[in-house]
Amino acid sequence: MNVKGTPTRTIWPAREGGAVWIIDQTRLPHEFVTQRLNDLGAVAHAIRAMLVRGAPLIGATAAYGVALGMAEDPSDEGLTRACQTLLATRPTAVNLRWAIEAMAESLAAVPPDQRAQAAWAKAGAICDEDVALNEAIGDHGLGIIKDLARTKGVEKGGEGPINILTHCNAGWLATVDWARPWRR
C-alpha cells in the first residue's frame, strides 16, 4: 500500500535492526501514527492492546516478537519464554499460534548464538510469504470479480452492483501488505 506516495507495509524492520515499526491501528482513522517496538514486551503489548489487527498481521508481529525475544535471550529457555509470552496475548488467534510454532520449530535446532539472526530472517520470510499469499488471493479474486462483471453485464450498464462480503478484518491493514491486483 502507498502512504503519501511511499510503499508501506503494516510492519517493517527498523533500518538499523533490533526493532520493528508498526502502524498503530488504535489511532486510525483520525491519525496515522507509527510506533517502534524495541523488545518482546512491546510486541506483546501491541498484540494484546490491538495496536495491530487482523490474523495475518498478528502472526507476522508475533514472529518479529520471537526474533526480538531471541535478541534478549537466545537460550532454549528464552525461546520457550518468548513463545509463551506471545501465545498468552491472544490465545485463540490461529495465525499467531501458527507463526509462533513456525518460529519455534525453525529455531529449535539453531545454536543459541545464531538464533537472533536466524529468527530475524525467519520473521522476514513469514512477512514475505504473507505478501505473496495475498497477491495470489488477489489474482484469484480479481478473476472471479471480472467473471461476475461479465456475467452481470456490468461493463455494458447491465445489472449491478457486485457485492463482496469479507469475513473478519480484511484488506491491507489486516495483513503485512496487500495484493497488487486490487490496485489495478
Swiss-Prot record:
Molecular function GO labels: S-methyl-5-thioribose-1-phosphate isomerase activity
Pfam families according to UniProt: IF-2B (PF01008)
Biological process, per Gene Ontology: L-methionine salvage from methylthioadenosine
Family: Belongs to the eIF-2B alpha/beta/delta subunits family.
Name of the protein described by the UniProt record: Uncharacterized protein in petC 3'region
Species per Swiss-Prot/TrEMBL record: Rhodospirillum rubrum
Source taxonomy: Bacteria, Pseudomonadati, Pseudomonadota, Alphaproteobacteria, Rhodospirillales
